[in-house]
């Protein structure tokens, strides 16, 4: 596993995270202007940003989830050391675990590799 350090803080959004599962129907909203790989989806359990490749577009503004995705983000402070669980280079985000065991997504622009000791 790769260890990274937060070079800037990452604050999480005010809305609760959502989890979508394969076969689930969702309503598609706008594309994110900062993160164009993401589309805003509304599901039974709430709304959030999901990489568009996880959604099969349907008719109109609906879609079906292709692969499971959890939108949980991890708040970080500059200097935090994190373990990378998944690096999604396409979207520009990595799923990481903190020293306390919490997991979530952070923008790749906020982290850098820690050189081996």
Predicted regions located by residue number:
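Src homology 3 (SH3)-mediated interaction modules
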Residues: 1-117
């Amino acid at each position: 596993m790769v260890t990274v350090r937060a070079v800037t803080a990452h604050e999480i959004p005010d809305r609760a995270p959502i989890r979508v599962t394969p076969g689930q129907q969702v309503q598609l909203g706008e594309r994110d202007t900062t993160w164009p790989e993401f589309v805003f989806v509304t599901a039974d359990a709430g709304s959030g940003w999901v990489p568009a490749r996880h959604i099969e577009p349907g008719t109109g503004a609906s879609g079906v989830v292709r692969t499971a995705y959890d939108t949980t983000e991890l708040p970080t402070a500059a200097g935090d050391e994190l373990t990378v669980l998944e690096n999604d280079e396409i979207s520009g985000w990595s799923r990481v675990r903190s020293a306390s065991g919490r997991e979530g997504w952070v923008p790749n622009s906020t982290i850098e590799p820690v050189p081996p000791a």
